[in-house]
Amino acid sequence: MDYGFATRAIHAGQDPESVTGAVIVPIYQTSTYAQRGVGDHTGYEYSRTDNPTRTALQTCLAALEEAKHALVFASGLGASTTLMLMLKAGDHVICGDDVYGGTYRLFQRVMTEHGLSFDFIDMADPEAVRAAIKPNTRLIWLETPTNPLLKLAPIAAITRVAREHGIWTIVDNTFASPYNQRPITLGADMVLHSTTKYIGGHSDVVGGAIMTSNDELYEKLKFLQNAAGAVPGPFDCWLVLRGVKTLSIRMRDDERNALAIAQFLTEHPGVEKVIYPGLPSHPQHNLAREQMRGFGGMISILLKGGAEAANAMVSKTKL
């Protein structure tokens, strides 16, 4: 049976526990597992490799992104770093020019020291992406909408270009959440999330995730998840499972509030510009309507008066 998004968020990977019938996934707070004999385990042997609470979360997140597989990590950057370990010295990556600051730092300050090269371009035009491809390009890294300027990238068009050249694509879907956008259905090879943000939703846990429907990529990433070890503990996984149950409700309310605030700020005399994909004034509003279910809850604004006005606004903000 095909369940709706909200039902999958509550139930996918979360069947009642077989011994007690508990309807909430237990926190399997263990590092090791008893084996039936030498080399004969029941599916779990060491919690860096696998843990039942983590398995439940991975199953749930894969269902939400309509992917075959998901892997979770100790942070979004832990997921990003693990993914980059699939590349080798001399490989080239194309990335958006408004990528999340932590990702930019990882690429420019860390990965370049290990022989990778990067070009940061405007992802709005698929032909610009095509023009940036080199013989050694191995990965196209999309973030849409971007943090913080809410630029969009046409996922389906760019993934078509990537497939023509045998290049992997990954979409950082953190700002949209799987409720509003599912890049794998648009052709992406992989999707990345900081589960710290919308998926966890309660500001009480740090985590990351990668989803894919490509079996080969999954096996590579699963090996690296275990080998590099940037895995979340079972309590962190449980917190994300708890938070994701209300994702659909939170996203609907968040978008409704964001649109009302964006429309209000558009008319405010102290505001020079409001950037929100849900406004017709956003240069990629039509693309947002095409590839997103909703516009999300993130807004960027440019104030008249520059940094001084921005500092004054932040210092006076009450909520």
Curated annotation (Swiss-Prot):
Main localisation? cytoplasm
Q: Which is a Gene Ontology cellular component entry for this protein?
A: cytoplasm
Q: Which domain of life is it from?
A: Bacteria
Q: Which cofactor does it need?
A: pyridoxal 5'-phosphate
Q: Which InterPro entries match?
A: Cys/Met-Metab_PyrdxlP-dep_enz (IPR000277), Cys_met_metab_PP (IPR054542), PyrdxlP-dep_Trfase (IPR015424), PyrdxlP-dep_Trfase_major (IPR015421), PyrdxlP-dep_Trfase_small (IPR015422)
Keyword annotations of the record = Amino-acid biosynthesis, Cytoplasm, Methionine biosynthesis, Pyridoxal phosphate, Transferase
One MF term in the entry's GO annotations: cystathionine gamma-lyase activity
Q: Where in the cell is it found?
A: Cytoplasm
Write down the chemical reaction(s) this protein catalyses. Answer: O-succinyl-L-homoserine + L-cysteine = L,L-cystathionine + succinate + H(+)
User: Cofactor note, please?
Assistant: Binds 1 pyridoxal phosphate per subunit.
- N6-(pyridoxal phosphate)lysine occurs at K197
One GO biological process this protein is involved in is: cysteine biosynthetic process via cystathionine
Q: Which Pfam families match?
A: Cys_Met_Meta_PP
Enzyme Commission number(s) of this protein: 2.5.1.48
What is stated as this protein's family in its record? Belongs to the trans-sulfuration enzymes family.
Function recorded in the entry: Catalyzes the formation of L-cystathionine from O-succinyl-L-homoserine (OSHS) and L-cysteine, via a gamma-replacement reaction. In the absence of thiol, catalyzes gamma-elimination to form 2-oxobutanoate, succinate and ammonia.
Subunit structure of this entry? Answer: Homotetramer.
What's the protein here called? Answer: Probable cystathionine gamma-synthase
Question: What gene is it encoded by?
Answer: metB
